[in-house]
């Protein structure tokens, strides 16, 4: 499953990498598996 909900935390925003972007403002809608930015849930 390559959906944001499967890749990011249930809190809504989550890093695509273990390295957490403190701002987490980059909304990656495509290519989250590329390993950068964040995914938005819901």
Swiss-Prot record:
**One GO biological process from the UniProt record?**
defense response to bacterium
Subcellular location(s) of the protein: Secreted, Extracellular space, Extracellular matrix
Query: DNA-binding as a keyword?
Result: no
Q: Write down the InterPro entries for this protein, in alphabetical order.
A: Pelovaterin, Vaterite_Nuc_Antimicrob_sf
Q: Which cysteine pairs are covalently linked by disulfides here?
A: 8-38, 16-32, 24-39
* Keywords annotated in UniProt: Antibiotic, Antimicrobial, Biomineralization, Disulfide bond, Extracellular matrix, Secreted
Coarse class of the protein's main subcellular location: secreted
Tell whether Cell inner membrane is among the UniProt keywords. no
Output the Gene Ontology cellular-component terms: extracellular region
* Chain's role: Induces the nucleation and stabilization of vaterite, one of the crystalline polymorphs of calcium carbonate. Exhibits strong antimicrobial activity against Pseudomonas aeruginosa and Proteus vulgaris.
Name-wise, this protein is Pelovaterin
